[in-house]
């Protein structure tokens, strides 16, 4: 299934000229049917992943591809794998990678089917809504190299519980939970007001060396 260009917010081809994460949301191609990880959440997620040039990273539940683009901007010379079971999300991720001048292997699949075939990686991020959160996280942990970083973004308390219990059962280290509550300004006739966005939980951990 191809995304109709007319359904997207059309923007001219460009590249992000900075090393810092947090590319403005409006610079991405978007669709109302595919969620985008907001720029402030992306910036924090990238910091939790602890990326550097040459790393290999898996993005499970890539959605619009905004986080995949941010990852590619940090791991120049490395490799990125983006996975989603939604065909429109995969097409949108490819569009955003192209418009920012990055390359990644974008895979239309259920994560449980494709993760066993991917190489071991330095970092993995899991987002979106999956039917079997625990199994996907277990498989993700098995793909992490020693000292590899796992980051999970979720808006659901139930998913956070599943993630944390799985992480603790796997004896990961440096386990951290950060709740992100962002408010953005909006200009109104009488001044500027702040509009709150949905809280996001960012769970991060490190795979031990032994």
Task: Mark where each language-model region is.
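Conserved SAM-binding loop of SAM-dependent methyltransferases across substrates and taxa
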Residues: 64-76
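S-adenosyl-L-methionine
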Residues: 83-121
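Short beta-strand element of Class I
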Residues: 77-81
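C-terminal substrate-binding/active-site "lid" region of AdoMet-derived donor-dependent transferases
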Residues: 139-197, 201
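Short SAM/SAH-binding signature in class I
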Residues: 120-128
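Class I SAM-dependent transferase core
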Residues: 2-53, 58, 92-95, 99, ...
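A short, conserved alpha-helix within the catalytic core of class I
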Residues: 131-139
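Conserved S-adenosyl-L-methionine
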Residues: 61
């Amino acid at each position: 299934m191809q995304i109709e260009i007319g359904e997207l917010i059309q923007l001219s081809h460009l590249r992000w000229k900075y090393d810092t994460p947090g590319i403005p949301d409006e610079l991405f191609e978007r669709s109302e049917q595919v969620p985008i990880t907001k720029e402030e959440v992306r910036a924090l997620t990238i910091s939790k992943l602890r990326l550097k040039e040459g790393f290999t990273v898996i993005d499970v539940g890539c959605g619009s591809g905004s986080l995949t683009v941010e990852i590619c901007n940090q791991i120049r010379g490395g490799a990125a794998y983006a996975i989603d079971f939604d065909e429109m999300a995969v097409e949108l991720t490819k569009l955003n990678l192209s418009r920012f001048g990055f390359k990644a292997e974008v895979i239309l699949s259920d994560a449980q089917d494709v993760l066993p075939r991917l190489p071991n990686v330095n970092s993995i991020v899991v987002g979106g809504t999956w039917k079997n959160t625990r199994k996907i996280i277990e498989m993700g942990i098995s793909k992490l190299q020693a000292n590899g970083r796992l980051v999970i973004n979720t808006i659901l308390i139930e998913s956070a519980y599943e993630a944390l219990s799985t992480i603790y059962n796997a004896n990961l280290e440096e386990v951290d939970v950060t709740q992100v509550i962002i408010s953005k300004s909006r200009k109104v006739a009488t001044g500027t007001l702040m509009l709150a966005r949905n809280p996001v939980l960012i769970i991060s951990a490190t795979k031990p060396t032994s």
